[in-house]
Amino acid sequence: MVLRYLQDISQSISYITSASYKHVNNNHKVLKKGQIKDLKEIDNELSVMLKEISAIFETRNFTEIGKIIEERRDFVNHVTEIIERQVNRIRTEESSPKNTTLYFGNLLETKDLIQAVMSLLELYQEFELNLRKQTL
């Protein structure tokens, strides 16, 4: 299970970087301001989440994992809202198919990335709880 989640994380990161690099390297149009703003929001939230997870493991304060998991379910919902926002943008304004493909692809992979990280955390939380039960 752990290996599968790590592989999912790796594949999501690889897809996001590869698709973005190809888009830029092929001189496609830049993303719209709203799209860039949305991606920056996600980037900031993802950075905060990963820093919090890193701090948990550095301090070995594993009781905080449950809190992170609960908070980050809201993060997945936020990404879903951003996807819906883009659907509404497409309906009201003209958009480049290449930009839309890149944007949706990155959003969906980010959502998969978050879910894989959360699944890995949940698995570790379960392991930690079982370990505590055995030591009691």
What are these regions (language model features)?
Residues M1-L136:
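Cytosolic, long alpha-helical scaffolding segments
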